[in-house]
Amino acid sequence: MESSSTIDPAEVAKFEAMAAEWWNPHGKFKPLHQMNPCRLDYITQQIAAEFDRDLSAPLPFEGLRLLDIGCGGGLLSEPMARLGAEVIGADAAPRNIPVAKLHAEQSGLTIDYRNTTAEALAAAGERFDVVLNMEVVEHVADPLAYLTACRELLKPGGLMICSTLNRNPKSFAMAIVGAEWVMRWLPKGTHDWSKFITPDELYDLIRKAGLDPVDRKGMVFNPVSWSWSLSTRDLSVNYVTASVRRT
């Protein structure tokens, strides 16, 4: 794997240590498993709208080349492959790749998993219709350089979906104190609150990277139903954005 200025070795090491847990819905990635239906709802709706696809079709994303950056064990890569996309999953943590490959094989899916970075793929001339950049930007050393590499990975007219965590007292209380210290859904230190990014900051970075932000929504956890939903108004903790490369 080529080195990159945006890769934070300490952040990679955190996820390396949890690699075997990816497909355990009750393990260390339980929050992602719970959030996944909400993430997939947003992703599929945005792709369908941008590329005029019918989600009721058997393979609505057939013909689209999709990159899942920070793919981990493949929680998003696999559903995208089932919808017909040609999927490349990239992760900077080497131990995640064999876990993802094995699960895809067991699921009868063809997914190209690679231990590489956004910068290395861009330098190699790889281009995609869709780039998924989910819960990654808060873990990199240089968000603007990273998002610029994501822009280079998109074909003109391509779509980037980016999700992250807002930075405010509520997100500290819920994502750090609640999720890591009290509920212990995640190991302590999984997130660094100082690296969280407000929606306005992210929009500014996306524009500076050369992309046009077109949508953003909150992803809100309901502790009563124990489920996640999209919100047009509440972006106070988790949120997701859609951006397009125009030229």
Swiss-Prot record:
GO molecular-function terms, A-Z: 2-polyprenyl-6-hydroxyphenol methylase activity; 3-demethylubiquinol 3-O-methyltransferase activity; polyprenyldihydroxybenzoate methyltransferase activity
Tagged with keyword Nucleotide-binding: no
Name the UniProt record assigns to this protein: Ubiquinone biosynthesis O-methyltransferase
Disulfide-linked positions: none
Record GO biological process: methylation
UniProt xrefs under CDD domains: AdoMet_MTases
Residues annotated as binding S-adenosyl-L-methionine: R39, G70, D91, M134
Gene name of this polypeptide: ubiG
Catalytic activity: a 3-demethylubiquinol + S-adenosyl-L-methionine = a ubiquinol + S-adenosyl-L-homocysteine + H(+); a 3-(all-trans-polyprenyl)benzene-1,2-diol + S-adenosyl-L-methionine = a 2-methoxy-6-(all-trans-polyprenyl)phenol + S-adenosyl-L-homocysteine + H(+)
Organism field: Cereibacter sphaeroides (strain ATCC 17029 / ATH 2.4.9)
Annotated SUPFAM superfamilies: S-adenosyl-L-methionine-dependent methyltransferases (SSF53335)
UniProt KW Methyltransferase keyword: yes
